[in-house]
Amino acid sequence: TALAFKYFAEQKVDIAVIEVGLGGRLDCTNIITPILSIITNISLDHTQFLGNTLAEIAGEKAGIIKKGVPVVIGEYTSETKPVFRKKAQEMQSPIVFASDYKNQEVSFAIPIENGLEYNTKRYGRLIGELYGEYQVMNMNTILQAVHILTTKAAPIKISEESIRKGVKHVTELTGLMGRWQKIQEHPLVICDTGHNVAGWECLAPQIKSQPCQQPVSYTHLTL
């Protein structure tokens, strides 16, 4: 982590996206003061370190909320929302719950040949190359974060063209892999990094929605 921070500083990056390794409160990335914090979702994972309930895990995740720094919450449950809200109030940090109806940036999305076509509040039609219905929730979070970054007191300039390009070519630009990634078509082979209950709750309906020409016994999953 220290070497990464040093490299970012030497390269004079415009924005460094720092991903927390485990939890948040005690993670080594938490030494920085960001311009925006994002908590995507909470699930039962690494319970031996973070706690046995969603509320306990949310408390660890909420440790990244810094005084006065805006925070976007992608998804929440009845257990986790009060935890995030309380921490944000303590830190006097503006908080936005991206999945609340009033904050939703995406009205709907339809599958297309090369990903998803989103109908969005601020940018109209956006083409995203990542597959999976669960990407709608991710897109809500992303666009809400971009809105905050571009409209805060000292706004960061991000052109609409850059947003469209980033969404449409995310794999090429970032090297992101393993998000409902099609390895081949015949037979259909999918690679996805879903590794916990929450991940499989998203993957299961996606798998079920795929057209299948063979009897069910010919459909295989490899874990």
Say what each PLM segment does.
Residues 9-10, 89, 172, 208:
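Residue-level signal for alpha-helix termini/capping positions
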Residues 11-19, 39-125, 139-161:
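Acidic, Mg2+-coordinating active-site environments of NTP-dependent enzymes
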Residues 15-20, 28-38, 42-47, 56, ...:
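Nucleotide phosphate-binding/pyrophosphate-handling subdomain across enzymes
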Residues 2-25:
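Glycine-rich phosphate-binding loop used to anchor ATP phosphates in small-molecule kinases
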Residues 25, 80-83, 199-202:
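Phosphate- and divalent-cation-binding pockets in alpha/beta enzyme and binding domains
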Residues 4-8, 61, 203, 207:
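Generic hydrophobic alpha-helical segments
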Residues 3, 79, 175:
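Short, conserved clusters of charged catalytic residues that mark active-site
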Residues 4, 84, 219:
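Aromatic/hydrophobic pocket-lining residues that form π-stacking "cages" and hydrophobic walls in ligand
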